């Protein structure tokens, strides 16, 4: 299965370790609500894909679908055979094929990205990634996903696979929408586009969640700052990218119980990650940093506290956060994340 709908199996490498990982893009033919249709796809996938032990993430953006799947070869091929017969899309393009660890931690995740791009803009990136695949220049599946979903107008859009050119930071607030307020403020102050997305996972008892991001060119690197809803930490697609983040910024509320619950969620989300972001706890002097640090260390995470003073405005929050992010650029050795970042030594863990 390469450039058109076909039931032929992708090439297999029995000697390669881990799960088979495939990614394709296709033109969406859905004429009604795409989100509603993706929910119907989800209901079907949770029955069929689970039986095949295949984990899947589905993206809709600019008139295109992108599907990332991981699992045993037999199961992946069974899913692709069903994909080839599905009339909700056409012009299937295989963009990635490899064997390796499974990044997607749950059977189903999906994302809808809102941008001003035309389908032809997205198509150019699809053709670029198709050519990389044809030439055997395989990137990690997460890097392919980022390359496809990053608008070409963003700084460094074509260099998403180069970690030394990028710093990726996730921001989650213990209460309210502070993380989204911060990203919106960064977009306004830096005159940079804020990209709005919705994520959903496998759980029936959890609604879809918002996640926004902004790409800011600092000169030294392009810094992507991602606002994530608290519930979003439980979604497989969110967890698939955690090992690529240098830091997770926790915007603390000063309410000990809320801050505790946020830390518990973050530790759980990072539990299976081979590399983990450094945690920055940003809050007032009243925050219980010692307890949060204890929880982080128990979960194998580095925790640094960043006090913002009495001012809780977004400018003050960023003023407390940015120096720690900048310092990591000077001390990095194999970041993102813990496992070579140098932060483990700086924090005494």
Language-model segments: what does each one mean?
Residues 169-171, 250, 279-280:
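Hydrophobic beta-strand residues in large extracellular and virion-surface proteins
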Residues 234-256, 266-272:
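Inter-motif core of Ras-like GTPase G domains
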Residues 2-221, 225-244, 260, 297-305, ...:
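Charge-rich, low-complexity N-terminal segments
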């Amino acid at each position: 299965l390469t450039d058109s709908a076909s039931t032929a199996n992708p090439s297999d490498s029995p000697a390669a370790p881990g799960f088979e990982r495939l990614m394709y893009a296709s033109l969406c033919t859905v004429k009604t609500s795409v989100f509603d249709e993706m929910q119907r796809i989800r209901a079907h996938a949770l029955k069929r894909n689970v039986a095949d032990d295949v984990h899947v993430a589905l993206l809709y953006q600019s008139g295109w679908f992108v599907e990332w799947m991981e699992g045993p070869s037999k199961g992946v091929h069974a899913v692709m055979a069903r994909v080839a017969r599905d009339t909700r899309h056409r012009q299937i393009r295989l963009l990635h094929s490899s064997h390796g660890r499974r990044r997607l931690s749950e059977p189903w995740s999906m994302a809808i990205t809102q941008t001003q791009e035309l389908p032809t803009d997205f198509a150019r990136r699809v053709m670029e990634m198709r050519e990389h695949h044809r030439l055997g220049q395989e990137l990690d599946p997460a890097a392919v996903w980022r390359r496809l979903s990053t608008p070409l107008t963003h700084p460094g859009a074509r260099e998403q696979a180069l970690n030394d050119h990028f710093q990726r930071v996730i921001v989650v607030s213990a209460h309210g929408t502070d993380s989204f307020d911060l990203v919106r403020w960064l977009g306004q102050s830096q005159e940079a586009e804020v990209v709005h997305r919705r994520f959903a996972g496998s759980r029936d008892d959890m609604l879809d969640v918002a996640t926004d991001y902004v790409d800011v060119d600092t000169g030294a690197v392009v810094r992507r700052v991602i606002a994530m809803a608290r519930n979003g930490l439980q979604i497989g697609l969110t967890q698939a990218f955690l090992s690529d983040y240098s830091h997770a910024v926790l915007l603390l509320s000063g309410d000990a119980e809320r801050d505790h619950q946020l830390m518990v969620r973050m530790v759980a989300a990072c539990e299976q990650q081979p590399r983990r972001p450094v945690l920055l706890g940003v809050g007032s002097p009243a925050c219980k940093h010692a307890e949060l640090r204890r929880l982080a260390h128990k979960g194998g995470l580095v925790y640094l506290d960043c006090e913002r003073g009495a001012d809780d405005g977004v400018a003050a929050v960023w003023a407390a956060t940015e120096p720690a992010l900048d310092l990591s650029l000077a001390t990095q050795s194999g970041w993102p994340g813990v496992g070579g970042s140098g932060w483990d030594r700086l924090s005494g863990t």
